[in-house]
Amino acid sequence: MRLRNIPDALERIQNQNLLVKTPWNIDDSWIIEIGMGKGKMISQLAFDNPNKNFLGVEKYPSAAVKAIKYVKKYNLSNFFILISDAKDLLDRIKGKASTIWLTFPDPWPKNRHYKRRLTYKDFLEIYANLLVKDGILKLKTDNLKFFEFSIESLKENGWKITYQTNDLHNSLVNSSNIKTTYEEKWVNLNYKIHYLEAIFI
């Protein structure tokens, strides 16, 4: 579905004091979601973990502005937004996080676009530099081919997969899973969600 443009989206995010100034300094208390969309999952994580800090990275202000309603709903003070393309994160963030989430990234299914996939080696190198030692990269996707590509890419580029499942909602980790807006849509259509956790070694 096409994202409706909201002309004043960036201004509205700024007015809520959610927009970070770059370079933004972080430490191991931070958890990052890349491609947070409307922010449903990360805002719930922020509410459930008040002693952690959360940074939602989103390329499109018109999507990110939707997170404001969750900030108000949960009265969050530990959640912030960075408007950025993933390829620019090492210039925008200084320090290392404990966890990075990739939630339903564009699978770029055409072979000629494989370098755009967020689990291509160039992006994995960025994540490795943004995570503390033994920091965790977590991936959720509904696209099996993208999931299989991601597994191979991780293995080929110095990562160890510590957990994986092709059916997240019938897995051991489902009890702690928080659904994204996109995830809820596909689960209602009986799609299986693929999930993995990995560390850089």
From Swiss-Prot:
| Keyword hit for Methyltransferase | yes
Superkingdom of the organism of origin: Bacteria
Keyword tRNA processing attached: yes
The record's section on CDD domains has: AdoMet_MTases
**PROSITE patterns according to UniProt:** SAM_MT_TRMB (PS51625)
Q: Which reaction does it catalyse?
A: guanosine(46) in tRNA + S-adenosyl-L-methionine = N(7)-methylguanosine(46) in tRNA + S-adenosyl-L-homocysteine
| Spans traversing the lipid bilayer | none
Identify the EC number(s).
2.1.1.33
Positions annotated to bind substrate: K110, D142, T180, T181, Y182, E183
Protein's pathway:
tRNA modification; N(7)-methylguanine-tRNA biosynthesis
Which residues participate directly in catalysis? D106
**Cellular-component GO terms for this entry:** tRNA methyltransferase complex
User: Binding residues for S-adenosyl-L-methionine, per the UniProt record?
Assistant: E33, E58, D85, D106
Q: Which GO terms describe its molecular function?
A: tRNA (guanine(46)-N7)-methyltransferase activity
* PANTHER family, alphabetized: 3-DEOXY-D-MANNO-OCTULOSONIC-ACID TRANSFERASE/TRNA GUANINE-N 7 - -METHYLTRANSFERASE, PENTACOTRIPEPTIDE-REPEAT REGION OF PRORP DOMAIN-CONTAINING PROTEIN
Describe the task this protein carries out.
Catalyzes the formation of N(7)-methylguanine at position 46 (m7G46) in tRNA.
Give the protein family. Belongs to the class I-like SAM-binding methyltransferase superfamily. TrmB family.
Write down what this protein is called: tRNA (guanine-N(7)-)-methyltransferase
Organism of origin: Mesomycoplasma hyopneumoniae (strain J / ATCC 25934 / NCTC 10110)
Tell me the name of the encoding gene: trmB
